[in-house]
Amino acid sequence: MRHHGRMHARESDVAGGPARDSAGGPARDSAGGPARDSAGDDSPSAHRHRRVTSFRSRRSALSGGQQDTWERLWPELGTEARDDDGRPAALIDTAAWFGRTAPLVLEIGSGTGTSTLAMAQDEPDIDVIAVEVYRRGLAQLLTGIDRAGVRNIRMIRGDGVDVLEYMVASGSLTGVRVFFPDPWPKARHHKRRLLQPSTVALIADRLRPGGILHAATDHAGYAEQIAAVGDAEPLLRRVDLTDDLPISVRRPVTKYERKALAGPDVAELLWEKVP
């Protein structure tokens, strides 16, 4: 098996960091998904069985300030992956949503948005869609966007697989980021891991030629699985952190991650879609 890649993250002074159950850092979190276990698809096959999801259900209330920011900014900057009846959203017109045409990055499982915000600020010419299941994490990102005046981030609340399947066009993405998805360490739960062959194949289809899949995990077993699945996908080929890439792969190190650096190494895994 190829070398997985050691951590190449830059230090960040972004306040805070993801909670232990956020995907924005080594906190073991959702990879993005709706607050339900069912995929909610309209197709007959979807009604016959529930799709296994990669997130853990939980509820969290917003603070008064977060609620005010949510009500003010979410209608413009956010949307849902599914409607109240469970129907998937339509394909996104990203040019209309962002008000411009620019390279597009999808981050699945943005957590509290620490990495999302910092990387978007570093790349103002790239548009970023952050996908997260937890409303509180999205509200924290909205607050950061509001304070920093960032204009190149949009958000989707829901399942990252739904977003890939229904809302993103084939060949439209310059990059996909999956940072610290829930490793589901117990063997009987491995089927819940986000980066399965079917999901990686879907990501590869949505990437444009030369587009980048960037995954990071501090769970050794999950790193091995991600490496094997990515290397087995015929539309992807491994690239190095030092290569000339169309998007930045320098993610910020959150305060939580700095505390965790004495523990397991972080594996950074990158693939490029073949021409």
From Swiss-Prot:
One of its GO terms (molecular function) is tRNA (guanine(46)-N7)-methyltransferase activity. InterPro entries: SAM-dependent_MTases_sf, tRNA_(Gua-N-7)_MeTrfase_Trmb, tRNA_methyltr_TrmB_bact. Coiled coil: none annotated. CDD domains: AdoMet_MTases. Substrate binds at residues 186, 218, 254-257. The active site is at residue 182. Residues 1-73 are annotated as: Disordered. Its EC number is 2.1.1.33. Pathway: tRNA modification; N(7)-methylguanine-tRNA biosynthesis. S-adenosyl-L-methionine binds at residues 107, 132, 159, 182. Residues 46-59 have a biased composition (Basic residues). One of its GO terms (cellular component) is tRNA methyltransferase complex. It holds the Pfam family Methyltransf_4. It is an enzyme of class 2 (transferase). It comes from the Bacteria. Disulfide bonds: none annotated. Keywords: Methyltransferase, S-adenosyl-L-methionine, Transferase, tRNA processing. Catalyzes the formation of N(7)-methylguanine at position 46 (m7G46) in tRNA. PANTHER family: 3-DEOXY-D-MANNO-OCTULOSONIC-ACID TRANSFERASE/TRNA GUANINE-N 7 - -METHYLTRANSFERASE, PENTACOTRIPEPTIDE-REPEAT REGION OF PRORP DOMAIN-CONTAINING PROTEIN. Belongs to the class I-like SAM-binding methyltransferase superfamily. TrmB family. This is tRNA (guanine-N(7)-)-methyltransferase. It comes from Mycobacterium sp. (strain KMS).
